Amino acid sequence: MPFEIWHGLEDGERLSLTQEAFWSFSQHFQLAKDDQSDLNPGNSIVVDQLEEARLKAKGLAINLSGIMTALDLLTPPANTPLGSVPLGDSVFERKCRGYVIIRDYSFWTDRAVTFLGELKAKYSE
């Protein structure tokens, strides 16, 4: 979503989109973790890092729901869990999928930090 559109949204809309994004990331990290386990079965370090990221994304989504409830905003329904939809079975496609998940997670994390800082300043007054 372009910067101009994002900043044109109301706080509730931005909270909702951010909550949905991190709930989705918690599910996508599970996919990446499963891929990594298959691609490198002897390397638990990356799998452990993906699990940690999955739990953090899920925790943030839950906390964002709490913020929305505290502000009397409707919380979006939980996303439909990802199924076993074929997203590419080659090693290259699976590695690319992991890269895209990490790249987008980084983008949304930066966006969330900035937005939540603005929200804190706004509601702390």
Where are the regions a protein language model picked out?
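Long, contiguous alpha-helical bundle segments
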Residues: 1-103, 107-125
